[in-house]
Amino acid sequence: VEVQGVGLGCCYGYRVHGPVSSAGPGFHPTKVLLDPCARAISGWDVYQRGMAISDHDNSAHCLKAVVTERDHFDFSNHPRPRRAWRETVIYELHPGGFSRDSNSPASAEHRGTFLGLIDALPYLQSLGITAIELLPSMAFDPADAPDGRQNYWGYSPLSWFAPHHGYVCGDDPLAGRQQLRQLVAACHDHGLEVFVDVVYNH
């Protein structure tokens, strides 16, 4: 879907009309749905998980996609190391948890974020690893957990293409893409490859 005149940073969602059935999933035009291909998401400050499953209009309490730039990040100045598998040593880490602790090499304002991982790259490099594997880094609902617990690990993502807002410095929904790109570029500059953990069944 392309809408002429929509600018960078504009928020949007979908309403889908069709038959409504009490027997199970169907169309529900009172619901604003997130674009499954969204590259950025806004509305975390007003999002209410319960409104997504109620019969009421959720437009005031839903997540919305954000129009992002269409250009691709130029990694030509930050080439991937391309090590052979037999030479690869992977360090799996949680994008938020790794740098959140006060003993982390991350600066205080970057703790728990993609930028905090950049601060920690000299330490990671000193371990002799050749790659990092990020546990799920895409947008997920922290409330998607039983008994009032938190979804800390990031599985069951809401959007496969938008970075998780909790790993981003600042409130700008467009900053997530840039900060994740900065992390990947910095890893390459430190001789480290980057793998992203994705699990499609949960």
Where are these regions (language model features)?
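Aromatic- and acidic-residue-enriched carbohydrate-binding clefts of CAZyme catalytic domains
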Residues: 104-113, 144-189
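Ligand-binding face of N-terminal immunoglobulin V-set domains in extracellular IgSF glycoproteins
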Residues: 1-3
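Short amphipathic alpha-helices and their capping/turn segments at secondary-structure boundaries
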Residues: 77-82, 119-128, 184-188
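Carboxylate/His-rich catalytic cores and anion/metal-binding grooves
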Residues: 124-145, 149
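The feature marks proteins involved in alpha-glucan
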Residues: 5-92, 99-109
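Active-site beta-loop-alpha junctions enriched in small/polar residues
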Residues: 96, 137-139, 199-201
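A conserved hydrophobic secondary-structure block that centers on an alpha-helix together
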Residues: 96-132
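Hydrophobic faces of well-ordered beta-strands that scaffold small-molecule active sites
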Residues: 89-91, 132-134, 194-196
